[in-house]
Amino acid sequence: MEGILVIAHGSRAKETEATLDTVLSMVKAKLPDSVIECAFMEFSDRTVEKGVSALAAKGVTEIKVVPYFLFMGIHLKEDIPSLAATCAASFPDIKITMGEPLGADERLADILVDRIKG
């Protein structure tokens, strides 16, 4: 069974966690058979390690790490792969793979246009 770990940056503003929870509720509605957890890189106790542990406790055999980031910055180039490797060592029976950041995507451009036109 595949699990999904969505990782966001995190913020001192705690409402950002609620925003991601709302987005993940929308995702879960579209992928009802998926096992999804989220984690934050900073300013939260919802760490990558805790997210992987939660998925492992639910019996997943694979985890796809999906970054909720726009750009390929230092967290995506170094920090998240390092954390994923540490988690993989702790859970050797679980295959962990990395997804891509949101990046340059036509759908994001559409959202931006909607916001501009308001």
Predicted regions located by residue number:
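Active-site-proximal alpha-helix that buttresses catalytic centers in soluble enzyme cores
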Residues: M1-G118
